[in-house]
Amino acid sequence: MQAEIGIIGGSGLYSMPGVSDVQEVRVTTPFGEPSDPYVLGTLAGRKVAFLARHGRGHRLLPTELNFRANIHGFKQLGVERIISVSAVGSLKEEHRPLEFVIPDQFYDRTKQRVSTFFGEGIVAHVGFGDPVCGEMAKVVKHATDKAGVVAKAGGTYVCMEGPQFSTKAESNLYRSWGFDVIGMTNLQEAKLAREAELCYVTVAMVTDYDCWHPDHDAVTVDQIVAVLLKNAENACSVVREAVAAMPKDRTCKCGSALATAIITNKDVVPAATKEKLKLIIGKYFGEQKAGA
């Protein structure tokens, strides 16, 4: 069974209500095992694949996530677009708990992550100036409006290593830099989705004010979970509306991100590397059709 739209559920969102014709699929990738089996089915008349980012039961730290396997697994299933739902802390007064942000920029503060499919004899530099698919972001913003959810379009998501939350010094530094929200996972997903030529958008659910706000307690796990439980229905409604409204065909440039990115002559790329990356680079090396 194939899918066209991928959904990544973050903290508090480990399943997607409303999906019919459900089939659970374990996918093995050249980069190892994804976080969990993918749940395939039909949502709002579209074929979707859902993945619990941290595994059901929330077993995996952000640093432990196999981001490459997660994204490659979606690619193997035929997915072309990914909606990533994530809990975030707010770095601005105007982004209140229970509200959503649809970031259009990311800033990387991670230290221990693998953020590329390339290496091992092949070099590629994809454009990442606009890390989010603009077409998807518009659809998601319209979906939040239709679902009656307060959401801001645009803003910067700073991705920290974790698993500890920020110090006040860090939180205030990020605020001084003008960042909007803080999380621990979406930067790697966005980079790898771009390399895999998949469209990607984040639906950031604000759960707290990190630790900077003088009138609010510093973030705790209990606080996050309580807000997420209240927000789960909103998140599912937004995803459902977005899936229903997503155009059938892509007219953005995400699907050709590697067209001018691969710098290594294909004749010198090791055979093992070619095989490992076949699904991603095959159409440029004349070894498969796009989307195969």
Swiss-Prot record:
<keyword id="KW-0660">Purine salvage</keyword>
<dbReference type="GO" id="GO:0017061">
    <property type="term" value="F:S-methyl-5-thioadenosine phosphorylase activity"/>
</dbReference>
<dbReference type="GO" id="GO:0005829">
    <property type="term" value="C:cytosol"/>
</dbReference>
<dbReference type="GO" id="GO:0006166">
    <property type="term" value="P:purine ribonucleoside salvage"/>
</dbReference>
<feature type="binding site">
    <location>
        <position position="11"/>
    </location>
    <ligand>
        <name>phosphate</name>
    </ligand>
</feature>
<dbReference type="InterPro" id="IPR000845">
    <property type="entry name" value="Nucleoside_phosphorylase_d"/>
</dbReference>
<keyword id="KW-0328">Glycosyltransferase</keyword>
<feature type="binding site">
    <location>
        <begin position="53"/>
        <end position="54"/>
    </location>
    <ligand>
        <name>phosphate</name>
    </ligand>
</feature>
<comment type="function">
    <text>Catalyzes the reversible phosphorylation of S-methyl-5'-thioadenosine (MTA) to adenine and 5-methylthioribose-1-phosphate. Involved in the breakdown of MTA, a major by-product of polyamine biosynthesis. Responsible for the first step in the methionine salvage pathway after MTA has been generated from S-adenosylmethionine. Has broad substrate specificity with 6-aminopurine nucleosides as preferred substrates.</text>
</comment>
<dbReference type="InterPro" id="IPR010044">
    <property type="entry name" value="MTAP"/>
</dbReference>
<feature type="site" description="Important for substrate specificity">
    <location>
        <position position="221"/>
    </location>
</feature>
<dbReference type="Pfam" id="PF01048">
    <property type="entry name" value="PNP_UDP_1"/>
</dbReference>
<dbReference type="GO" id="GO:0019509">
    <property type="term" value="P:L-methionine salvage from methylthioadenosine"/>
</dbReference>
<feature type="binding site">
    <location>
        <position position="185"/>
    </location>
    <ligand>
        <name>phosphate</name>
    </ligand>
</feature>
<protein>
    <recommendedName>
        <fullName>S-methyl-5'-thioadenosine phosphorylase</fullName>
        <ecNumber>2.4.2.28</ecNumber>
    </recommendedName>
</protein>
<comment type="subunit">
    <text>Homohexamer. Dimer of a homotrimer.</text>
</comment>
<comment type="similarity">
    <text>Belongs to the PNP/MTAP phosphorylase family. MTAP subfamily.</text>
</comment>
<comment type="pathway">
    <text>Amino-acid biosynthesis; L-methionine biosynthesis via salvage pathway; S-methyl-5-thio-alpha-D-ribose 1-phosphate from S-methyl-5'-thioadenosine (phosphorylase route): step 1/1.</text>
</comment>
<feature type="binding site">
    <location>
        <begin position="208"/>
        <end position="210"/>
    </location>
    <ligand>
        <name>substrate</name>
    </ligand>
</feature>
<feature type="binding site">
    <location>
        <position position="184"/>
    </location>
    <ligand>
        <name>substrate</name>
    </ligand>
</feature>
<dbReference type="InterPro" id="IPR035994">
    <property type="entry name" value="Nucleoside_phosphorylase_sf"/>
</dbReference>
<feature type="site" description="Important for substrate specificity">
    <location>
        <position position="166"/>
    </location>
</feature>
<feature type="binding site">
    <location>
        <begin position="86"/>
        <end position="87"/>
    </location>
    <ligand>
        <name>phosphate</name>
    </ligand>
</feature>
<keyword id="KW-0808">Transferase</keyword>
